[in-house]
């Protein structure tokens, strides 16, 4: 790859479109399609999740600092949504989309969804499975079913289960038969728009995979996504790909981190389906090996684009030297799949960014370069900023070192209080999934 020109390729999509079916809701009720041209384009539509009881039912997950105080978390989140709406961004709530999708589908689909949800909840006892299934069937409405799915089912919610076999004995000290969907606050972790298509992300974590079932059914049965192309799905085998490792830095280019959550097979699988779709504007993937930076490090913890030439970075990302370019070809591999051309790039990280944006980048080191401040603001999701438009961002107010530096660069900064929201693993960026940017 030269520093001034990036290769463009065309081809054919290798992954079938989602198995959508005839829907009862009229399509004119919904906008159709998705489109994201870059991380910083004007934000038109998003998916968000209003914090519910699941946010204070975090009792055994090491990813959260602690359970959130629900009332305060809801107020903080409402301020966040208010900023989006004042900007002109349409907000679709996750539970509303799921309700619309299941309402549009056949009754059999709803029953299958409940059963699949229970199967992915890790229930090993037939009696417990039946008790939970009957509990769902006893609820008055689909709205109640969805609320219970997100909030979890406690042992005390169902009638006492009489053990019929040894596997029916409840030996766990957890108060839950089905754990809450505690990560629902972060739609970006599970579902993301890439150009004019979408990706469902692949993980080995059983809890996160259970969350992604919600997005699979929305994708398959909601009129909004009828005909939208799916580039990765939950059925991908023997590979990993995480939304936190993907940054759409321009209309044609994705940056992807090779990490403990995103492996080379996952990147190749995404590349094969995405880059060979000639209707999608994305034509290249730049893969950066970030393994050496730690097991819990994803690319969006190392770099955040905040304007056409401005980036927040963690100092260590400048040490990244193993970088690859992936593009589509017209050839086929021995397995008959579209062949992906790849080559190592002999540029350092800063030179790669300069080549992509075609100008000298301006890097702001998180925390202002102070080692203690950098660690503190990385932990407080200072890198997880959400772009509303070029040079206009939403941030947590507590990251004042970085916020002040961005303010000095002339950025428009919307600060939200985050005494509770910052207890979670992510910032404003992952609290929404962008559906449309322009």
UniProtKB/Swiss-Prot annotation:
Pfam families: ADI. Keywords: Hydrolase. It comes from the Bacteria. One of its GO terms (biological process) is arginine deiminase pathway. InterPro entries: Arg_deiminase (IPR003876). The keyword Lipid biosynthesis does not apply. GO terms for molecular function: arginine deiminase activity. Belongs to the arginine deiminase family. PANTHER family: ARGININE DEIMINASE. This is Arginine deiminase-like protein.
């Amino acid at each position: 790859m030269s520093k001034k020109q990036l290769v463009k390729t065309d081809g054919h999509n290798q992954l079938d479109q989602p198995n959508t079916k005839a829907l009862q809701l009229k399509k004119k009720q919904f906008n159709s399609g998705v489109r994201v041209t870059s991380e910083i384009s004007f934000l038109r539509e998003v998916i968000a999740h209003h914090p519910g009881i699941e946010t204070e039912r975090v009792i055994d997950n090491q990813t959260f600092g602690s359970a959130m105080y629900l009332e305060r978390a809801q107020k903080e989140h409402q301020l966040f949504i208010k900023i989006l709406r004042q900007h002109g961004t349409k907000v679709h709530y996750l539970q509303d989309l799921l309700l619309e999708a299941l309402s549009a589908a056949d009754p059999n689909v709803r029953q299958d969804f409940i059963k699949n949800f229970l199967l992915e909840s890790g229930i090993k006892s037939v009696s417990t499975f039946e008790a939970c299934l009957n509990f769902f069937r006893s609820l008055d409405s689909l709205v109640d079913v969805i609320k219970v799915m997100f909030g979890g089912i406690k042992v005390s919610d169902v009638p006492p289960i009489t053990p019929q076999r040894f596997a029916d004995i409840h030996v766990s000290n957890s108060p839950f038969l089905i754990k809450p969907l505690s990560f629902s606050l972060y739609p970006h972790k599970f579902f993301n728009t890439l150009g004019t298509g979408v990706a469902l992300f692949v993980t080995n974590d059983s809890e996160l995979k259970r969350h992604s079932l919600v997005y699979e059914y929305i994708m398959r049965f909601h009129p909004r996504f009828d005909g939208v192309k799916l580039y990765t799905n939950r059925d991908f085998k023997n590979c990993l790909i995480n939304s936190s490792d993907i940054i759409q830095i321009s209309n044609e280019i994705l940056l992807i981190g090779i990490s403990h959550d995103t492996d080379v097979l996952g990147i190749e699988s995404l590349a094969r389906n995405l880059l060979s779709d000639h209707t999608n504007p994305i034509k290249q993937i730049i893969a950066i090996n970030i393994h050496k930076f730690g097991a819990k490090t994803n690319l969006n913890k190392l770099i955040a684009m905040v304007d056409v030439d401005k980036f927040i970075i963690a100092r260590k990302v400048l040490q990244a030297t193993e970088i690859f370019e992936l593009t589509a070809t017209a050839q086929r591999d021995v397995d008959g799949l579209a062949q992906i051309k790849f080559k190592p790039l002999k540029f350092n990280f800063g030179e790669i960014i300069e080549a992509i944006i075609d100008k000298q980048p301006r890097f702001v080191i998180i925390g202002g370069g102070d080692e203690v401040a950098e660690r503190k603001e990385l932990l407080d999701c200072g890198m997880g900023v959400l772009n509303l438009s070029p040079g206009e961002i939403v941030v947590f107010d507590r990251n004042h070192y970085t916020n002040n530096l961005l303010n000095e660069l002339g950025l428009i900064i919307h600060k939200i209080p985050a005494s509770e929201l910052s207890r979670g693993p992510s910032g404003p960026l992952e609290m929404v999934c962008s559906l449309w940017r322009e």
